[in-house]
Amino acid sequence: MARQHPIQDYRNFGIMAHIDAGKTTTTERILYYTGKNHKIGETHEGAATMDWMAQEQERGITITSAATTAFWNGKRLNIIDTPGHVDFTIEVERSLRVLDGAVCVLDSNQGVEPQTETVWRQGDKYHVPRIVFCNKMDKTGADFFKCLSDIVDRLGAKPVAIQLPIGAENNFKGMIDLVRMKALVWNNESAGAMYDVEEIPADLADKAKEYREKLVEAAVELDDDAMAAYLDGKEPEEATLKTLIRKAVISGAFYPVLCGTAFKNKGVQPLLDAVVDYLPSPLDVPAIKGVDANGNEVLRHADDKEPMSLLAFKIMDDPFVGTITFCRIYSGILQSGTGVINSTREKRERIGRMLLMHANNREDIKEAYAGDIVALAGLKEARTGDTLCDPENPVILEKMEFPDPVIEIAIEPKSKADQEKLGVALAKLAAEDPSFRVTTDHESGQTILKGMGELHLDIKVDILRRTYKVDANIGAPQVAFREKITKPAEVDYTHKKQTGGTGQFARVKFQVEPAEPGAGFQFESKIVGGAVPKEYIPGVEKGLNSVLTSGVVAGFPVVDVKVTLIDGAFHDVDSSALAFEIASRAAFRDALQKGKSVLLEPIMKVEVVTPEDYTGSVIGDLNSRRGQIQGQDMRGNANVINAMVPLMNMFGYVNNLRSMSQGRATFTMQFDHYAEAPANVSAEVQKKFA
């Protein structure tokens, strides 16, 4: 079957926004007007087509990006719905990674909100061309012009209005199209399906003229011929102006701004027209870079004739189909039944069912082409960020980078049956979401869940309970302390048990000293003349190792210590490996006491990105958490603060930072080193654990 839609008619785009800006409602309306949805799903009734997980329908926020295919004016739209909550930014990152363009939705009442800044920065990182839709123009306090100034002040970007609102709040009737210089006015009877194209109202004529001039001036800057014609007094024709706006969007020179109210069905069709007219096709964006089998950089162009390559950007567990892997095909043609290689993991796979997804419905297809976004059922090895490609032409496409988790909790299943279900469920959840990690604490034997924030882990626990029917207790977050000696110590210890029958005898003399940070445990025997026979040395080491797991301060593992066996004695009959193990254990514990053992705590490297206004509060708060500020610098129009902070003082920080900065600051943290805990902290921990 040949390709039905030329690749230049594809628009792979996402809708990005702050939580509650009306992103899912906008997507719903797009699906409605492109004829994919017969009944509009309202988010606040918990029934939106894109928000199909039970957790999303209850909370009314979008958690999983669902991919949907629709058509408008003969163009094929692949829409990815992205979440707007800070704990789900990983979802936004991986969506932006495979998109060619995006619509940024703003709440006209709120303007640019905190999460808008975060997703905008991610869009900048991946150079995603964007248009802006000022939604909720019918809301009290809606202000289109404040949105324009916010984009300049808070995003450091250049907005250019291509529409102006007619009326606002309850009187919002439609918009002036500055490209065509016509008024688009909706009649309320047709659920927004019909609107009239009229002359611009007289009271708005001057404003329309002023903003039309701004638009034309910004557009002609991109083309010398158009600029020369404009300076000669020639206005660009509509087709020329659209070409120039498209050029601006693709190059990032400026961002066209539209307005409307998705909920009241006004302005969605012109938004779709703008997606088709101004957002790039796969041919308009740079070819994706990759690395071939020899480590050389290669390019894969959006072309059916090139070797097949695709990137897995999302894994989902579907109750009917099993594991579904969402992929963007960057080059070549993919057919069901073909063998592919997962070049990231060097594993071979066979393509079984291939599906086009529409929110929660699916359509089986046999063939997909460069530029398509498809769902593959039944892949065993693929993980998010993996490359699948033609075995004859292996390539690894640009990898996605995922942040390390910043919060962890312990989970304990309530019964044996839950224990078995938990293992399977956690493996699936970790495969679906690279920012969610599962580890086992070797010291406590507990299963530890790590994630991007408290809401992130709440939702994972909720999925465990609902989808996988696992009942479990959730613990409070914990810190992994360590212990270390601070000065050298020498001990001479004799273990003697000789009361008739086979006795026990062993004498050991150790020199114990602190080792370099990160050196771990080092053991050396300097025995000469057979004072301790060779066959007993393993017993000595076993005794020492048994103490390492539980030190003398508060029972935490001992690190960075060197033990030298310098002398000893044995008995021909009563000595054994066990006797030397017991002697070594007691001697080592004595040495740890004599060597003034201290408690070590993990220190985290913390980076906070905050608007200038909150810098003082953020630094003050980090200082109150025993943080040491390492430096500050500017990134765009945000301030970046680097600090070293003890992990035990970082619990709950994500929520504190959010409220301190009205959600506008973000942070990342990773383990850096262990450092001696202050006496008061050590005393508190000893009281709790020892």
From Swiss-Prot:
GO terms for biological process: ribosome disassembly. GTP binds at residues 17-24, 81-85, 135-138. InterPro entries: EFG_II, EFG_III, EFG_III/V, EFG_IV, EFG_V, EFG_V-like, EFTu-like_2, G_TR_CS. One of its GO terms (cellular component) is cytoplasm. Residues 8-283 form the tr-type G domain. One of its GO terms (molecular function) is GTPase activity. Keywords: Cytoplasm, Elongation factor, GTP-binding, Nucleotide-binding, Protein biosynthesis. The keyword Cytoplasm applies. SMART domains: EFG_C, EFG_IV. It is found in: Cytoplasm. Belongs to the TRAFAC class translation factor GTPase superfamily. Classic translation factor GTPase family. EF-G/EF-2 subfamily. Catalyzes the GTP-dependent ribosomal translocation step during translation elongation. During this step, the ribosome changes from the pre-translocational (PRE) to the post-translocational (POST) state as the newly formed A-site-bound peptidyl-tRNA and P-site-bound deacylated tRNA move to the P and E sites, respectively. Catalyzes the coordinated movement of the two tRNA molecules, the mRNA and conformational changes in the ribosome. HAMAP family: EF_G_EF_2_B. This is Elongation factor G. It comes from Afipia carboxidovorans (strain ATCC 49405 / DSM 1227 / KCTC 32145 / OM5) (Oligotropha carboxidovorans). The gene is fusA.
